[in-house]
Amino acid sequence: MNSKNYHQKKRFGQHWLVNKKILEKIKEIAVLNENDFILEIGPGKGALTSKLLDSEIKKLHAIELDKDLINLLNDKFNNNDKFSLQQGDILSVNLDSINKKITKVIANIPYNITGPILDIFIGRLGIIRNYNYEKIIFLMQKDVVDRILSKEGSPNAGALSIRIQLLSKIKRICDVPPSSFSPPPKVFSSLVVFEPIKNDLRLDISLEKYIDKLLRISFNSRRKMLRNTLNSILSNEEINELSESSKVCFNLRPQDISIHQWIKLAENCIKIKKKI
């Protein structure tokens, strides 16, 4: 298939990056080397794929959902030994055979699957990862990135920002206007680099699970004060003890609590529960 004859499908949320400066920037921040095994999600017509394959990398494995693009991509790159292609949905495809080989993940994420993509590649609190990615480069909706990077006291602060910041180091490289895509989306995007925190440097898994529990309970009623959300799992006496031991005011709302304070709350909550 000739790429000029292909028309994007709305159901796949296809907005292809056409800004050459941003394409070059992605290659630059990836800092590719001869040992890199790259996973590219949704290569589209292969604009970024071409740039990545021009680098000194070991392998690039691309996963594309759109069957009509598979032949196009194979025709374009089938003579390149470093390239392999798999047709499938990234939300359900089995990566077990290559997951431990992958060093870097690169993707222009469809906005409608951002949450599940983050769960798969950044991970979840309380769950050990079966991979060890060095770097994840995502081009994603700016509003979501604003939420992920938000600190306590911000109206954007939420369970998502705390979970992601506990699991990875995050850096926003730049914001990307709609005009950089074809067709242009209705919103701005951001180019972001995640560096997942290695399993052996993460918090204790049981502690992560308890933090996740507190976040889920608290942010389900984010307008309520902490005292009125945690009373579903703690008595008034326990709440007072936890507030004092953690040096956290329970008249605050969950978005006003720092990551360090959430860790202290979970640690001390576990200690209090062990007394019972």
UniProtKB/Swiss-Prot annotation:
Binding site for S-adenosyl-L-methionine: 15, 17, 42, 64, 89, 108
Protein name per the record: Ribosomal RNA small subunit methyltransferase A
Gene3D superfamilies documented for this protein: Ribosomal RNA adenine dimethylase-like, domain 2, Vaccinia Virus protein VP39
EC number(s) stated in the UniProt entry for this protein: 2.1.1.182
InterPro entries, per database record: KsgA/Erm, rRNA_Ade_diMease-like_C, rRNA_Ade_Mease_Trfase_CS, rRNA_Ade_methylase_Trfase_N, rRNA_adenine_dimethylase, SAM-dependent_MTases_sf
Name of encoding gene: rsmA
The species this protein was found in: Prochlorococcus marinus (strain MIT 9312)
PROSITE patterns: RRNA_A_DIMETH (PS01131), SAM_RNA_A_N6_MT (PS51689)
Keyword Methyltransferase included in the entry's annotation: yes
Its biological purpose: Specifically dimethylates two adjacent adenosines (A1518 and A1519) in the loop of a conserved hairpin near the 3'-end of 16S rRNA in the 30S particle. May play a critical role in biogenesis of 30S subunits.
GO terms assigned for molecular function: 16S rRNA (adenine(1518)-N(6)/adenine(1519)-N(6))-dimethyltransferase activity; RNA binding
Catalytically driven reaction(s): adenosine(1518)/adenosine(1519) in 16S rRNA + 4 S-adenosyl-L-methionine = N(6)-dimethyladenosine(1518)/N(6)-dimethyladenosine(1519) in 16S rRNA + 4 S-adenosyl-L-homocysteine + 4 H(+)
PANTHER family, alphabetized: DIMETHYLADENOSINE TRANSFERASE, DIMETHYLADENOSINE TRANSFERASE-RELATED
Family under the similarity heading: Belongs to the class I-like SAM-binding methyltransferase superfamily. rRNA adenine N(6)-methyltransferase family. RsmA subfamily.
SUPFAM superfamilies hit by this protein: S-adenosyl-L-methionine-dependent methyltransferases
Keywords: Cytoplasm, Methyltransferase, RNA-binding, rRNA processing, S-adenosyl-L-methionine, Transferase
GO cellular component: cytosol
Subcellular location: Cytoplasm
Matches recorded under NCBIfam families: ksgA (TIGR00755)
Main location group: cytoplasm
SMART domains attached to this UniProt entry: rADc (SM00650)
One Pfam family it belongs to: RrnaAD
CDD domains from the UniProt entry: AdoMet_MTases (cd02440)
